[in-house]
Amino acid sequence: MNIIWIIVFLLTLLSGCGYVSWHVWQLLPLTVAGKWIVTGAMLLSIVCLFTNFIFGLDDKPMRVAVTLYELGNSSVFIGLYLLMLFLVLDLGRMVHLIPRSFLYNSWTGTVSVVAVMTGLFVCGYLNYLHKVRVPLVLESSRHLCRQHRLVMLSDLHLGYHNRADEFRKWVDKVNAEQPELILVAGDIIDGSIRALADQNMAAEFRRLKAPVYACLGNHEYLSGEPQAKRFY
């Protein structure tokens, strides 16, 4: 059954890559060489995702590992949004809302697609920077002499993408809440203990000004449970 699901996943992925690549090829008002360069670079980015997973990144210099991680993982999301965008454009062409010329060797179409994709990812990045604070009031059946203040975090996914500079800001936000206790509900690690060690993430955790209680998440098991426990 697992093999069947793997085959279905790979066929779906290949179909999506083929659909997006074909549309990009048709859309670009470039020479054949130019089309090959652009579509080839896109496909190599997808391949990078799989080579990162198969061969790993921990044996590479940190800057190289970060670059390969960002390239491979970003390509999935860019490809997914391109897939949805081209599906909408194809639907618009079928109902005669979008002229066929918009999708074939078109500077107008190319600039429009680039503008839409840039706008989507800029908005997404700005939303990512805005960390949402959700206040929760928990009632106790037992009498408490005073109120207690806790902060809970989840899915930090620290590593090659969420790096030390970013985590430093999160620590500052947590300390600003002045909690008595900090809870972390798993997935501190994204997938590599080495990425945390090289960036001395432990030093940032030590800046937290309250006791920390954390549990393992699935990414801790993926990165290696014994190593994750030692880091904890």
List the model feature ranges, each with a label.
Residues 1-129:
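Non-catalytic terminal accessory segments
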